[in-house]
Amino acid sequence: WIMGHMVNGLEQVSEFLNLGANAIEFDIDFDQNGVAKITHHGIPCDCGRLCTKQTVFTEYLDNIRHVTTPGDPKFREQLILLALDLKLQRIPVEKAYAAGVDVATKLLDHYWQRGKSKARAYILLNLPLVQDYEFIRAFKDTLKNEGYEQYNDKVGVNFTGNEDLDEIRKVLKKVGVDKHVWQADGITSCFARGTDRLTEALKRRDTPGYNYAYKVYAWTLVKYSTMRRSLRLGVDGVMSNFPDRVVEVLKEEEFADKFRMATYDDNPWKKFTG
């Protein structure tokens, strides 16, 4: 999975897909009551990137629904995963549940259209910190209460704050999640980061019966050297400001026989077994 990073403007969707991304990540900014308002990162953000692009969240979902619906004039077959970077760290922790209800409801209304839409992308809910676990509970409660639990098949969760992997496992157990789990490891592209935690996450992914890391990805990679390093470790995905660079690296002799771009037929909730 090649994830285009910080794709918050509508015009950026095509831009990142044209560079080779098959997944996009966008930031969800909330008001203080936990209502998802806009796609927006804000300052500071990655080096060399404009941090201020934004779109009304529901408009973004309406647009991306077209892009991920087969037969739609805007359809782009390669876009198979949407990663929602939930900026929950900006709101009171007690509002995490309200935020989960709101995001689930907006996906139901504007992306899935309560069963009418044929939009097919998988959804990855990226939570910054384990303290926000009530968001997950609320999201699942809302799908159940509204009668659309079938969409759980399309949704996964991921904690992005580089917290202790055992703490993440405990929190996921607490909310009854033991499948559809990704694990991210990384840092803003402005800084270097070691591989200790990434290596540990990959080790857990490869441990039979471990259910709290089906896929592991590294973020936000901009240097060819760090892309190669992560691929050598065996990551499932890379998040980058430059998807075209990841595409280039994947074509190199060292990686061409070991990796390929994920397609819609690849289940993001299953461990890759070769």
Curated annotation (Swiss-Prot):
Binding site residues for Mg(2+) = E25, D27, D85
What does this protein's record comment on cofactor binding?
Binds 1 Mg(2+) ion per subunit.
Tissues expressed in: Expressed by the venom gland.
Subcellular location field: Secreted
Which residues are responsible for catalysis? H5, H41
GO biological process annotations for this chain's record? killing of cells of another organism; lipid catabolic process
Q: Which cofactor does it need?
A: Mg(2+)
Report the principal subcellular site.
Answer: secreted
CDD domains named in the record: GDPD_like_SMaseD_PLD
Q: What is its EC number?
A: 4.6.1.-
One term of GO molecular function: metal ion binding
Tell me yes or no: is Lipid metabolism among this UniProt entry's keywords. Answer: yes
Q: InterPro entries from the entry? A: PLC-like_Pdiesterase_TIM-brl
Reaction equation(s) it catalyzes? an N-(acyl)-sphingosylphosphocholine = an N-(acyl)-sphingosyl-1,3-cyclic phosphate + choline; an N-(acyl)-sphingosylphosphoethanolamine = an N-(acyl)-sphingosyl-1,3-cyclic phosphate + ethanolamine; a 1-acyl-sn-glycero-3-phosphocholine = a 1-acyl-sn-glycero-2,3-cyclic phosphate + choline; a 1-acyl-sn-glycero-3-phosphoethanolamine = a 1-acyl-sn-glycero-2,3-cyclic phosphate + ethanolamine
Highest taxon of source: Eukaryota
Q: What's in the keyword line of the UniProt record? A: Cytolysis, Dermonecrotic toxin, Disulfide bond, Hemolysis, Lipid degradation, Lipid metabolism, Lyase, Magnesium, Metal-binding, Secreted, Toxin
Disulphide-bonded residues: C45-C51, C47-C190
Q: Which class of enzymes does this protein belong to?
A: lyase
Q: Name one GO cellular component term.
A: extracellular region
Q: Which family does it belong to?
A: Belongs to the arthropod phospholipase D family. Class II subfamily.
Q: Describe the function of this protein.
A: Dermonecrotic toxins cleave the phosphodiester linkage between the phosphate and headgroup of certain phospholipids (sphingolipid and lysolipid substrates), forming an alcohol (often choline) and a cyclic phosphate. This toxin acts on sphingomyelin (SM). It may also act on ceramide phosphoethanolamine (CPE), lysophosphatidylcholine (LPC) and lysophosphatidylethanolamine (LPE), but not on lysophosphatidylserine (LPS), and lysophosphatidylglycerol (LPG). It acts by transphosphatidylation, releasing exclusively cyclic phosphate products as second products.
- Protein name stated in the entry: Dermonecrotic toxin SdSicTox-betaIIB2i
